[in-house]
């Protein structure tokens, strides 16, 4: 029997292809200078690894929480947020509060463009980021995976075609025990996609908690169910349940490297873009 030469991780291969296409499209004669905020976290290390050895992008600045300045990070020492103006793009996976502050600093200095993967945004922090997007280009996404963004498109299409009177929508998500916000940014992104498909605002139809005697499920509700435990990288399911059949759309993440590669692809894409708030649907060309 011959060897099976199929890629065991086709999504990883697809993400690499997208990143390579973006690199070819780049007309820059010098590497895109990348700053990394949240460098000491799991995603920070994964992104640094994804940048290592790339010709079209170079890590020139690494940041983390106050008090870490001067600590070694690979060939660099951790710097301060005020230095981000010397970067072309800053990739930030920290907290929503820190991301909003970083956006303010970028606005004050007129640079750099931002790629933000932080989740758990308050309304005030979201407004702060949107105001900054009037001055700098920002890509924000609850998930930088190619597969999840395809899933969001499928969820929106299904919600548009499956009537709320007959089909209930529930978003399930599971993550490792160290994740501090719930529902996940990805779950909310999928909920937003479902709500768009039904022509509704998620805030008007979401149900995030159930306890005790809750009564019948409201028609058109989009529910969220959350699990935290162990080292789960990320599991997301969107269930469309009718009386006689159930449709389940699911994505499983096996390695943080796929998110890191997606973030690098977003950084290459957003470098030199006009101010505005973008997401991975823009980066991947899914939105005309």
Outline where the language-model segments fall.
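Rossmann-fold NAD(P)-binding glycine/threonine-rich loop
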Residues: 118-138
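ADP-ribose/adenylate-binding Rossmann-like module
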Residues: 105-124
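N-terminal Rossmann-like NAD(P) cofactor-binding module of classical short-chain dehydrogenase/reductase
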Residues: 90-91, 115
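Intrinsic-disorder-associated, low-complexity terminal segments enriched in Asp/Asn/His/Tyr and depleted
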Residues: 4-9
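C-terminal substrate-binding/catalytic lobe of Rossmann-fold NAD(P)-dependent oxidoreductases
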Residues: 33-84, 166-288
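Short glycine-/small-residue-rich Rossmann-like dinucleotide-binding loops
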Residues: 94-95, 119, 228
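Short, ordered loop/turn segments at secondary-structure junctions
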Residues: 65, 119-121, 143-144, 174-176
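Arg/Gly-rich low-complexity intrinsically disordered repeat tracts
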Residues: 11-13
């Amino acid at each position: 029997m011959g060897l099976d030469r199929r890629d065991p991780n086709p999504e990883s291969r697809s993400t690499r292809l997208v990143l390579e296409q973006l690199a070819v499209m780049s007309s820059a004669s010098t590497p895109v200078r990348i700053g990394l905020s949240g460098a000491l976290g799991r995603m920070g290390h994964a992104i640094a690894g994804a940048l290592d050895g790339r010709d079209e992008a170079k890590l020139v600045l690494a940041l983390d929480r106050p008090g870490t300045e001067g600590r070694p990070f690979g060939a660099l020492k951790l710097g301060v947020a005020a230095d981000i103006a010397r970067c072309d793009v800053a990739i930030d996976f920290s907290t929503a509060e820190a991301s909003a502050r970083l956006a303010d600093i970028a606005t004050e200095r007129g640079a750099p463009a931002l790629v933000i993967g932080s989740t758990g945004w308050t309304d005030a922090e979201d407004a702060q980021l949107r105001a900054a997007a009037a001055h700098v280009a920002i890509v924000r996404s609850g998930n930088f995976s190619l597969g999840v963004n395809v899933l969001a498109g499928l969820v929106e299409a299904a919600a548009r075609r499956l009537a709320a009177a007959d089909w209930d929508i529930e978003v399930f998500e599971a993550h490792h025990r160290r994740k501090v916000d719930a529902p996940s940014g990805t779950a909310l992104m999928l909920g937003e996609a479902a709500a768009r498909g039904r022509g509704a605002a998620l805030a008007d139809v979401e149900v995030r908690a159930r306890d005790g005697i809750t009564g019948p499920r409201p028609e058109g509700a989009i529910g969220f169910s959350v699990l935290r435990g162990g080292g789960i990288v990320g599991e997301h399911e969107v269930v469309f349940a009718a009386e006689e059949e159930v449709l389940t759309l699911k994505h499983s993440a096996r390695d943080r490297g796929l998110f890191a590669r997606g973030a690098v692809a977003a950084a290459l894409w957003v470098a030199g873009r006009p101010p505005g708030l973008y997401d991975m649907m823009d980066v991947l060309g899914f939105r005309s």
